[in-house]
Design a protein with these regions (language model features):
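N-terminal Rossmann NAD(P)H-binding glycine-rich loop of SDR-like oxidoreductase domains
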Residues: 2-22
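SDR active-site strand-loop-helix element
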Residues: 6, 29, 54-58, 93-99, ...
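Adenosine-cofactor binding site in Rossmann-like domains, unifying the SAM/SAH pocket
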Residues: 25-44
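NAD(P)H-binding glycine-rich loop region in Rossmannoid oxidoreductase-like domains
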Residues: 40-75, 100
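Conserved Rossmann-fold NAD(P)-dependent oxidoreductase catalytic core, especially the SDR/UDP-sugar
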Residues: 60, 81-110, 127
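NAD(P)-cofactor binding segment of oxidoreductase domains
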Residues: 66-93, 114, 118-119
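NAD(P)-dependent short-chain dehydrogenase/reductase
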Residues: 106-110, 114, 118-166, 171-176, ...
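C-terminal substrate-binding subdomain of Rossmann-fold SDR/epimerase-dehydratase oxidoreductases
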Residues: 156, 160-255
Length: 255
């Protein structure tokens, strides 16, 4: 099976490739080979090529979903429409969505993800896997779970800017969902990549604080509870490692 991953240098794309390259023929072109903002680049890349699955992770604005820069909306839609222009070159498309579709729909990033998901529903064999938060040892050092595991390892206070309910999924479990969609048929058009049980940032910090035989203080920058960032789980009949085991795995790899 031949799979194209767009946005090949990104965190999710690299994680998919590292996990599945032995099972599938995975193509992860750099921007010099496939620039989704340039139709000439797309024409050249797709010439005489066909893929069983395209996993669309390429996106602008993901590092700051509140960014008001309207070019984020423009370029995200340009990339997706350019990809659509080559739909005869692939059988299935898996779009990596975002919780920002639901919780930040008035931002250029959230609005673009919302429009893309609506377009997904217009095509057979197009699907959205909506990610709220994803983590493992390879995520950016500033991300909530990894940053606080590192603080715990260094015996430093953990930091919670503002407590909230938030859905995180361990990267290996996200890969399991992606592979389910790679191989599956008669699939839901969109699913939230979340666990059945909701978790607060405070609860996640408490899990980290129980990783060894000592505890560290937890510092709150704001003691009020913020808006939740969660989705309804789907029943995909997948056995997950789960949030707690994912945190344990990250700790064991970082310590």
């Amino acid at each position: 099976m031949k799979i194209l991953i767009t946005g090949g240098k990104g965190y999710i794309a690299k994680s998919i490739n590292n996990s599945l390259w032995e099972k599938y023929h995975i193509v992860t072109p750099g921007r010099d080979e496939l620039d989704l903002t340039d139709i000439k680049s797309i024409d050249k890349f797709f010439e005489n090529k066909h893929f069983d699955v395209v996993i669309h992770t390429a996106i602008k604005g993901a590092t700051n979903v509140k960014d008001p820069d309207e070019t984020i909306l423009f370029w995200n839609l340009v990339m997706f429409y350019n990809l659509l222009s080559k739909e005869e070159h692939f059988k299935k498309l898996i779009n990596i969505g975002s919780g920002a579709e639901k919780y930040s729909p008035d931002t250029p990033y959230g609005y673009s993800k919302n429009i893309i998901n609506k377009l997904v529903h217009k095509y057979d064999n197009f699907y959205t896997l909506r990610v709220y938060g994803v983590f493992d040892e390879n995520e950016n050092d500033t991300r909530f779970i990894k940053a606080n595991i590192k603080r715990y390892i260094n015996n430093e206070p953990m930091i919670i800017h503002q407590d909230r309910l938030m859905d995180f999924i361990y990267m290996q479990d996200l890969i399991s969902i992606i592979e389910h969609y790679i191989k599956g048929e008669d699939l839901e058009k969109e699913v939230n990549c979340v666990y059945e049980d909701e978790s607060s940032l405070n609860y996640i910090a408490s899990l980290i604080n129980n990783l060894s035989n000592y505890k560290v203080p937890i510092t709150y920058n704001n003691h009020h509870t913020s808006e939740s960032y969660i989705g309804s789980p789907a029943d995909l009949s997948i056995t997950y490692l789960g949030l707690e085991q994912g945190i344990i795995n990250v700790y064991n790899k970082l310590k």
